[in-house]
């Protein structure tokens, strides 16, 4: 059995790594990957806490978070494909210069 502190520290490290990738990178694909890492870190924290207290709620929240991440990834990748077809790059600065 993994102690609660170890699991939560791992989840916090993963969350900070995802947040760092989201803030530092200017490529939308890497920003999407960072967001996925953050969602998985939060889901890991739910599973660790649920395991510690002997509840199945953490696993239920994990399933919900994974389904949310799948929906977010599919929409994000569809937007990335359209952006790449129109602009031929995935730089966030080119998105902010849209017409309209």
UniProtKB/Swiss-Prot annotation:
Highest taxon listed in the record's lineage: Bacteria
GO cellular component, one term: NADH dehydrogenase complex
Record's subcellular location: Cell inner membrane
GO molecular function, one term: quinone binding
Keyword Cell membrane: yes
Catalyses which reaction(s): a quinone + NADH + 5 H(+)(in) = a quinol + NAD(+) + 4 H(+)(out)
First-tier enzyme category under EC: translocase
Membrane topology field: Multi-pass membrane protein
Keyword tags: Cell inner membrane, Cell membrane, Membrane, NAD, Quinone, Translocase, Transmembrane, Transmembrane helix, Transport, Ubiquinone
Main location group: membrane
Enzyme Commission number(s) of this protein: 7.1.1.-
A single GO BP: ATP synthesis coupled electron transport
InterPro entries (UniProt xref): NADH_UbQ_OxRdtase_chain4L/K, NUOK/Mnh_C1-like
Sequence intervals crossing the membrane: 4-24, 28-48, 60-80
Keyword NAD: yes
Classification via HAMAP family: NDH1_NuoK
NCBIfam families membership: PRK05715.1-1 (NF004319), PRK05715.1-2 (NF004320)
Record's subunit section: NDH-1 is composed of 13 different subunits. Subunits NuoA, H, J, K, L, M, N constitute the membrane sector of the complex.
Family: Belongs to the complex I subunit 4L family.
Protein name: NADH-quinone oxidoreductase subunit K
Provenance organism: Cronobacter sakazakii (strain ATCC BAA-894) (Enterobacter sakazakii)
